[in-house]
Amino acid sequence: MRVYNCHFCSSPVYPGKGIMFVRNDSKEFRFCRSKCHKNFKMKRNPRKLRWTKAFRKAAGKEMVVDSTLAFSARRDVPVRYNRDLVEKTLEAMEKVEEIRLKRERAFYKNRMRGNKAAQLEEDRKLVEAHPELLREREVELRRMQEAGEDDDDEDMSEMEVSEEEESEEEREKVEIALKSKSKRKMRA
């Protein structure tokens, strides 16, 4: 079974799936779905569309240069069947796949390394720009603490609530949420 790659987005095209376009010079273009075929006909550049693998590789979001990627290259030269060779090839394929996955994980971790610091800096800027958000949060925390102190004073018997009462409260919350959503839709 031969699995082709989509000419536009580079995703796999399995037998019996996708569309094949054959140009006058007998060049074959295989597409995984109509979306890719339509974009190809519109002469769009796959490197500019964020959902294609070409974009991800061009933008540095996926590994481009790695020795494990060379093993998946297509080889058209037929080789005489040899049982030992097939067995070794299958074992090597598994090892190469494991190595590739490890390297991809390491590449992703390396790429995401600075995100925490950047997010923290963004949050800091947001708080500096809108200090009222912190005040609102402080008020909420005080209310929660006061409510917690009031609950401690009550008996444990009063704290126990039957399952029926809890389910009724949940239904009321859902109804309130649905009403607020419908109001938002009416406003928009």
UniProtKB/Swiss-Prot annotation:
Residues 140-188 are annotated as: Disordered. Keywords: Cytoplasm, Nucleus, Ribosome biogenesis. InterPro entries: L24e/L24_sf (IPR038630), Ribosomal_eL24 (IPR056366), Ribosomal_eL24-rel_N (IPR000988), Ribosomal_eL24_CS (IPR023442), TRASH_dom (IPR011017). GO terms for biological process: ribosomal large subunit biogenesis. It is found in: Cytoplasm; Nucleus. One of its GO terms (cellular component) is cytoplasm. Residues 147-169 have a biased composition (Acidic residues). GO terms for molecular function: structural constituent of ribosome. It holds the Pfam family Ribosomal_L24e. PANTHER family: 60S RIBOSOMAL PROTEIN L24, RIBOSOME BIOGENESIS PROTEIN RLP24-RELATED. Belongs to the eukaryotic ribosomal protein eL24 family. Involved in the biogenesis of the 60S ribosomal subunit. Ensures the docking of YALI0_B00990g/NOG1 to pre-60S particles. Activates and recruits ATPase AFG2 to cytoplasmic pre-60S ribosomal particles. Associated with nucleolar and cytoplasmic pre-60S particles. At the end of biogenesis it dissociates from cytoplasmic pre-60S particles and is likely to be exchanged for its ribosomal homolog, RPL24. This is Ribosome biogenesis protein RLP24. It comes from Yarrowia lipolytica (strain CLIB 122 / E 150). The lineage of its organism: Eukaryota, Fungi, Dikarya, Ascomycota, Saccharomycotina.
